[in-house]
Every structure is written in structure tokens, then in C-alpha cells.
Amino acid sequence: MKSLMKLLGLAVVLSVTACSQQQEEKKEAKTNLAGVVESKVISSAIAYQQAGGKAEFMDGEVIKITDQNYAHAETAKNYRNWMAKGANEGISHLRILAPRGKKAPTVQMNHDCLYSVAITKVVAGKISFEIPQDVLVYTSVQVIDQYGHGQQYIVTKGKHTVDFDISDGTTHAFLIWRSGLEKGMNVAKANQDKLTTWGLVSGDFKVPNYDFEAVDAKTAELRSEVTGKAFYYTFPRNEKEVTDRHQWNLECALGWGGASPIANEANLYTNSKMYSGEKSYSTTFMNPESVYFSSITVYNAQRYLFEDEEVKNVNSNTWLVNSDNTVTISFNCGPDAKNNIDTKGQDYTFTVRYYGVTEQVIRANNKDAVPNRLNPMFMMTEVTQ
């Protein structure tokens, strides 16, 4: 009988303890979700900003910029820019081609897709989002932490709940949906309309109070370092994978928001050195045959799209392929040249993007690669007219 009473007593204690733990967990969850609002669709990021959209900042003194915190600060700047377009309230659709020049909210945007962005709170080390089953074009979701790392890149349709490394103190994720332009603007916009707010936890992000003028100055300084040589991105997936802080700072300055290369799924990016817009060049390389598509886009020295609307990009959905399965891209070689990009006499750097990059291309395009025909940077030559 005594044993039975002891067991009953123990059961009561365990039950009370379990209830207390559940109440604490509920209280903690409620505290963690303080300030959260119901996620909504911002139909036009531009209209939202024009109506007075702005970012909300943390209290406290202005934070000085150091080599150690630069990536966090540059990331905060991008969160800030997209908050002004509604991304803290749900999913915000940029219904136009990426803006040219410094009007762009993010460096090195491209004209391969339309962008939709959301800032979402990390809950219990996870975030959730959806790629609907009935999307009309290439659709991906990239998940970026507060240090600029693309922790996840998803192309699979469906509802996703993914692990998110918060060991560096990250509390929110920056989600980028890309809707491909392979079927034109109208279809890409219709694809944006299919995207949902499923899984988003919106409304409570505040921007760290960095000295953003100093951030911009540091960014310009870093970009100036690499104008004379090709640049290859590594995009480590979290802070623990950063082995060279300066390299990572360069990557954030030149191409914040890029994805970590995963063969046959995510993307690879490479930047050329600066070239004179008064000369003619071409590069002929093996067809990269990316799973989705590849593209080449030109930028100015600050890595923004040229203001001139007539400066276009070239994309594998439309480029001409040579009979030997090579691709020739021409720069300022005249309208009759194959796949010609005219920079209107302006000096430029070009970026190659491989969406769904192959393992072979990854091996051929990195800082340790020897000259090879899968690397457009190595094949660039001046053309005598």
C-alpha cells in the first residue's frame, strides 16, 4: 500500500512538473511572438514605399563598423531597404525589373527574374514558407540569415519547414522568392500572385542601429579592391563556415544575397574584372548546361545595373549556341555579333550566374581553377574590328 501511495505521489509530482513546463513554454512562445502581426501580401513593393514605407530601428547608440561586424551591418542595410518596401509585414512583390543604379535595394540584382521578399521570425530554430504546386515558371526560395549567409536554397514545390542555424544570434530570416522571366513579364507577375504567406511570422524585426554611412563607405572601399581581377564567390552557409573574414566581407560588398553553390540545385556566381567599354571583347566557352538556366549581366564598378535601359543581359533561354556546343558572348562588338551586350561605351564588369549549377562547372569556376573552357573569365579576348 505504501508503495502504491508513493507511486501515486510521484505521478502527481510529475504531472504538476509537466504542466508547469508546458505553461512556461507557452509563456516563452507568447513572449517570443510579441509584436508579430498577421502576415499579408504586399502587392506592390514600390507603391508601399511611395506611401511612406520605412524601417523601424533598435534603440541605443549608433554602432561603429569594424571588419568583424561589417557583414552583419551590410545585411542589416538590406533588411532595412526591403522593410521600406513592406517585407516586414509579409511577402512583398517587386513587380518591375530590378531597378537600375543605386535605386536598387540590393547590389547586383538581375533581370533573370522578378523578386518577392519577406522577413520572417525564426521560431524554435526553424522557419517555414511555401512554393505552391501550381507555379508557372522557375521559382525558388533563398533563406538568408542576419550575417548574409544563404543557409537554404529551395526549388522543390510544397510547404517547407527547415532548420535554421541561430548559433550566431540570428533571430530573423530574409526570404527571397525568384520568379523566372523565361515566359515574359506577365507570366512572372502571375507567378508572384500564386505565392503565399504560409509559414511566415511577420512584423517584429527591428534594424540594428549601425552607422550606415560608414557601411556604404566600407562597401565602396571593398569593391575597389577587386576591379582589376576576376572574383569568385564561396558563400559559406553560416558564420561557422567562414574561414577568411576579409573574403566574406568582399562577397557581401560585391554580391550580397547570393546562394551557396549546391550542384544541380542552387546557384554559382562569378564576377569578371573591369573592362573598357571603348573596346570590343568576346568570350567563347563550353555550354554550361545548368539545370534551369544561365545568364550574363553587366554592371558598373559599384556593381549596380547600368542606368541606360538599352544595356541588356543575355540569358540561356534565348542565347544562340554554336554548332560545337559552345557559347559566344560579345561585348560592344556591334548588333550583328553573336549574343552582343552593348554597354554604350561604359566600362563594365560582368557576372555569370548558373541556376542549378553542375558539379563540372563548380570545379571549373573558383579561385584555384586553372584556365579551362568552362570558365568564361579565362576565355575573354579583345576583338579587333
Model-based region annotation:
Residues 27-385:
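A compositional/structural signature for long, glycine/proline-rich flexible linkers
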Residues 15-18:
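C-terminal motif of bacterial Sec signal peptides marking the signal peptidase cleavage site
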Residues 4, 24-28:
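Generic N-terminal leader/processing signal
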Residues 2-10:
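Sec-dependent signal peptide recognition
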Residues 20-22:
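Bacterial signal peptide processing site
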